[in-house]
């Protein structure tokens, strides 16, 4: 939900970037766009409002790699700030037009949506109304708020409202039954972890209740990208159990 608003409202986006740069006391600003977004999907210009666009590579979760690249690029040269395009649009509206943020940009998609699109929705809009607006074609088995990997499922569509943090609404129907098998020790979760952790070992120690081992294995470094759960052939809820542990620890509960 960043590319669409950036291209549709490029003047506001560029204006917001300039305001942010001025506040930081710099003129060095660049728009970063993932290289895998081809021009056949959407035409990406070379700049917006005179601010250059740079195509960057990397795989999911690309933000982590992007932050590492920026940290290396500006090492010893000063600090940097990474902001979303939609945030820059709202910054421009607030600073130049005096409009407080009362809307947010939401991607509405999924195989139950007839006309997927980016919608600028007022805060507090019922999620069900967004789905109706974009042509809900059949009853979904799952509705996810947020991305397909890191989003959260909801069942109360009438009372679930659009919030500032709502980036996407995905209505999905699948006939697959949920299942999980015993871990086969394939090591795929370790291979895909962008933080270099061993999710399989962390999960084993979590289930044993070995808190010390869990901490030593670096559970606090987990970014909750859920790559481990996605790649697992046994459908183990690796990321889910790690998140539950961290939530309990944060709340002062005994995991």
Predicted segments with their positions:
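Active-site gating/interface segments in enzymes
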Residues: 70, 136-184
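Iron-sulfur-cluster electron-transfer modules
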Residues: 1-39, 46-51, 56, 60-62, ...
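Hydrophobic alpha-helical positions that pack around
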Residues: 6, 23-127, 133-138, 147
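Conserved active-site and cofactor/substrate-binding residues in soluble primary-metabolism enzymes
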Residues: 5-15, 24, 39, 83-90, ...
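Ferredoxin-type iron-sulfur electron-transfer modules in oxidoreductases and energy-metabolism complexes
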Residues: 168-180, 190, 194-230, 234-255
């Amino acid at each position: 939900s960043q590319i669409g608003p950036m291209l549709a409202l490029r003047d506001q986006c560029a204006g917001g970037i300039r305001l942010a740069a001025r506040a930081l006391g710099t003129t060095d600003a660049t728009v970063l766009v993932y290289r895998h977004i081809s021009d056949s999907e959407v035409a990406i210009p070379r700049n917006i409002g005179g601010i250059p666009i740079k195509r960057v590579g990397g795989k999911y979760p690309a933000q982590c790699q992007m932050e590492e690249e920026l940290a290396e690029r500006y090492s010893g040269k000063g600090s940097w700030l990474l902001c979303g395009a939609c945030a820059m649009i709202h910054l421009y509206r607030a600073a130049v037009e005096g409009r407080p943020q009362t809307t947010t940009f939401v991607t509405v998609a999924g195989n139950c949506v007839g006309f997927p699109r980016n919608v600028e929705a007022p805060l507090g809009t019922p999620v069900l109304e967004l789905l109706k607006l974009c042509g809900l074609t059949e009853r979904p088995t799952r509705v996810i708020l947020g991305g397909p990997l890191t989003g959260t499922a909801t069942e109360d569509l009438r009372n679930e409202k659009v919030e500032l943090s709502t980036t996407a609404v995905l209505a999905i129907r699948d006939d697959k039954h949920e299942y999980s098998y015993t871990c086969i020790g394939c090591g795929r979760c370790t291979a895909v972890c962008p933080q270099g952790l061993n999710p399989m070992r962390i999960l084993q120690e979590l289930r044993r209740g070995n808190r010390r081992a869990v901490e030593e294995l670096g559970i606090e470094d987990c970014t909750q990208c859920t790559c481990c759960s996605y790649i697992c052939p046994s459908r183990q809820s690796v990321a889910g159990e790690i998140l539950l542990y961290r939530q309990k620890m944060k709340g002062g509960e005994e995991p």
